[in-house]
A protein has these predicted regions:
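Alpha-helix C-terminal capping/helix-to-coil transition sites in glycosyltransferase folds
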Residues: 43-44
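The conserved SAM/SAH-binding core of class I Rossmann-like methyltransferase domains
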Residues: 6, 33, 82
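FMN-binding flavodoxin-like domain, especially the glycine-rich phosphate-binding loop
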Residues: 24, 28, 56-168
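A short, well-structured beta->alpha microelement
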Residues: 28-40
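N-terminal beta1-alpha1 ligand-phosphate binding loop
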Residues: 2-27
Length: 168
């Protein structure tokens, strides 16, 4: 199954996760595409995985615009959505806030791949936000910090994405 993996990565974690996903799916059948390098072409692919970082509860603007603009094309192929971030307790909120119900209904899979903290890569408001969250993370379970990628989530996502749907 020929798969296009579209991602947006701010600190490198989503890019790393996209590469791990490709390895799980069989890299020879996958093409990685950074949304920041232009507009991807979906024709010629059997399925598509779209991934983004979550920053302050919001997915990347280019990924969001791509999903909206290419919704009909995505709904006509098998696709999945993955998110990367460090606030594990806020993932459900981010999914509801950023992904419309019809995307969740049509997606073969939606998964959280975890995240990695790279405080040295943040600047300004983001750096202050990260420091604030780190201070309260031990006190509020909703602000549970994740500083690792979940290989089991990537493996599960790959299995679900590559599984034959009942209609196939």
């Amino acid at each position: 199954m020929r798969t296009l993996i579209i991602y947006s990565s701010k600190t490198g974690t989503a890019k790393k996760c996209a590469a791990l996903l490709a390895a799980n799916l069989g890299a020879e059948n996958c093409e990685l595409f950074d949304i920041n390098s232009g507009e991807p072409e979906l024709s010629g692919f059997d399925c598509c995985a779209v991934g983004s970082y979550i920053r302050m509860g919001v997915i990347d603007k280019k990924i969001s615009a791509f999903l909206e603009k290419r919704r009909e094309e995505l709904f006509n192929i098998r696709f999945g959505l993955f998110l990367c971030g460090c606030l594990e307790g806020k993932v459900s909120d981010a999914i509801v806030k950023n992904l419309k119900d019809d995307f969740l209904e049509h997606a073969a899979c939606v998964e959280f791949f975890g995240g990695e903290l790279h405080p040295e890569k943040y600047k300004g408001v983001e750096k202050l936000f990260v420091k604030s969250v780190l201070k309260i993370s031990g006190k509020d379970p909703a602000f549970k910090i994740t500083d690792r990628i979940f290989p089991e989530s990537i493996t599960n996502f790959a299995a679900e994405l590559s599984a034959e749907s009942p209609a196939d």
